[in-house]
Each structure stands twice: as structure tokens, then as C-alpha cells.
């Protein structure tokens, strides 16, 4: 069996790699605006392959980190329900990759609607799992030493998710991308903190 530390290190590398790709998509001439456009819009066009690779790398990182947490990093052991929810996130992301989104100026299609449904599922699963895991991890060493960070990230994730939903309305749609990006960055930083804690536990 691969150790939790090894899984965590590989997971950290993958998540950091994803954030690198995420940053690159905002630097490359994609024609997408970081405030107005959804992140999934990067999948449509010449940079779609880069976006999909980032989606795969991010999912692998999440899976590795989750598998590490399954190895009961502390006492009491973590509940299995939020970990199972995290395992379902990559499944939802597969749906997002298979069914590309519709761009703002295009008519909504069945494919685009399915993409949005899978995206909603991925976001909801991610938030629910983080919401349930944060208080438990905060009571387990070594995460207890930076429990304030985990709780702060959890609050940022909640606020960004709420604002993300609010800005889905037509009047506020022009700033939807900003809060979607805040949600994605804050959740990935949360996973990085968790993975770093796993590595620190074995140090």
C-alpha cells in the first residue's frame, strides 16, 4: 500500500501543477475575461486542451489527497462520508469535460445544460466535503496547529460559493467569473493545506 505521505506529496504536486495551468490560462491570449467569463469557457477554443489537462491534473491531485485521508491520519478517525463525496468530485468533472459549456453569446444547448449540472454537482460536493472535514481536521494534530487557516479558508469558500450562486442571475452575470475563480482558488489552497499537514505529520 502506498503511504499517506507519498500520496499527499504526489497530491500536492498535482494540485500545484493545476494552479500553474490555471494561472497560465489567465496569461495566455484566450480572449476570456477573468471577471466576466466562467472558467469553463477556457475549454472552448484553441486552449481547450490545456484546460482539460488542468482538469485531469486537479482531479488526480484531489483523488490522491483523499486517499491519503482515508488512511486515518489521526484519532478519532475521519468520517467516511465527506471523503466519499470528494471521490465523487472527479466523476462530476468527467461530465464537465465530456459535455463542454456554451459560451455567453451562444444559445443554451442540451450539452451546455449538462455541463452546468455537472459543474453544480462538483461545486456542491466539494463544499459539502470541506464543510464537514474542516472542524474534524482542526481537532487533529498537526492540522490543529493551523486550524485558524482551515476555518478561514472554509469561510472564504462559503462566501465565494454564495456570491457565485447570486451572480448567476442575468443582472450580475458580468461578475460571475470573479467569484467562481475565488471559489476554485480557495478550495485548492484548502487541499494544499490539508496535504501539507499530512506531510508534516510524518516529519
Regions found by a protein language model. Name each.
Residues 2-31, 36, 43-202:
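Hydrophobic, aromatic-enriched alpha-helical segments typical of multi-pass transmembrane helices
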Amino acid at each position: 500500500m502506498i503511504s499517506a505521505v507519498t500520496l499527499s506529496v504526489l497530491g500536492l504536486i498535482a494540485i500545484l501543477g493545476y494552479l500553474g495551468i490555471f494561472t497560465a490560462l489567465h496569461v495566455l491570449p484566450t480572449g476570456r475575461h477573468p471577471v466576466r467569463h466562467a472558467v469553463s469557457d477556457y475549454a472552448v477554443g484553441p486552449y481547450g486542451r490545456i484546460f482539460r489537462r488542468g482538469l485531469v491534473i486537479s482531479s488526480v491531485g484531489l483523488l490522491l489527497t483523499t486517499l491519503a485521508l482515508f488512511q486515518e491520519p489521526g484519532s478519532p478517525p475521519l468520517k467516511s462520508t465527506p471523503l466519499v463525496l470528494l471521490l465523487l468530485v472527479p466523476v462530476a468533472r468527467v461530465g464537465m469535460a465530456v459535455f463542454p459549456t456554451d459560451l455567453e453569446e451562444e444559445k443554451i444547448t442540451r450539452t451546455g445544460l449538462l455541463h452546468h449540472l455537472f459543474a453544480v454537482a462538483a461545486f456542491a460536493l466539494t463544499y459539502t466535503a470541506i464543510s464537514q472535514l474542516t472542524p474534524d481536521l482542526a481537532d487533529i494534530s498537526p492540522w490543529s496547529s493551523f486550524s485558524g487557516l482551515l476555518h478561514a479558508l472554509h469561510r472564504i469558500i462559503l462566501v465565494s460559493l454564495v456570491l457565485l450562486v447570486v451572480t448567476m442571475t442575468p443582472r450580475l452575470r458580468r461578475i460571475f467569473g470573479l467569484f467562481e475563480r475565488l471559489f476554485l482558488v480557495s478550495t485548492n489552497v484548502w487541499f494544499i493545506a490539508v496535504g501539507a499537514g499530512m506531510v508534516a505529520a510524518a516529519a
